[in-house]
Amino acid sequence: HTRLRCDWSSDVCSSELVNLMCWESLPLFTELARRHPNTQMVVDHVGMIQPFVQPALTEPFADLARVISLAAYDNVAIKISGACTLSLLPFPYPDIWESLGKVFAAFGFNRCMWGTDWTRAVEFLNYEQGVEAFRVTDQLSDAERSVLMGGALEKIYNWSPNKG
């Protein structure tokens, strides 16, 4: 793992990759992405405020435009973790796809990585539901699903399950 060696107040950051949960700090994240173009930055949790208990938020994708604006920075990728907890409908969470489609269109699938976030989300769904919502949807082609469910992660994190 790369150690974080950044002086965020300067333009110097020697870290290769930084993951940040930034739902209440999107303007700061934007500034960091701009100032550190050689650092791969990953937005966690779709960049959205994530609920910890039911009911789901009434406007779960309220900051979508701000999150999508981060796609302008080539050094920014996004984890689609916790997306199912943003749904106002039960499994298979059909109301998340319009907003996620905008994220996919802005970032491209090569900068989007799936994740369940099920350990935080046990009040909303189990692991199987978090996986199956993305495996059974007709909103993704097989190629898009393959990149989203692992291909992008292997590239962004330079990791493979075969490396051990």
Regions found by a protein language model. Give the residues of each.
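Active-site glycine-centered loops adjacent to acidic/histidine catalytic or metal-binding residues
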Residues: 117
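Mid-to-C-terminal alpha-helical segments outside catalytic/metal-binding sites
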Residues: 102, 107-113, 122-164
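Short, active-site-adjacent cap segments at secondary-structure transitions
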Residues: 85-86, 120-122
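Alpha-helix N-cap/helix-start motif
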Residues: 7, 89, 123-124
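Single conserved hydrophobic/aromatic residue that forms the stacking wall/gate
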Residues: 1-12
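Catalytic pocket-lining loop regions of alpha/beta-barrel enzymes
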Residues: 10-113, 161-163
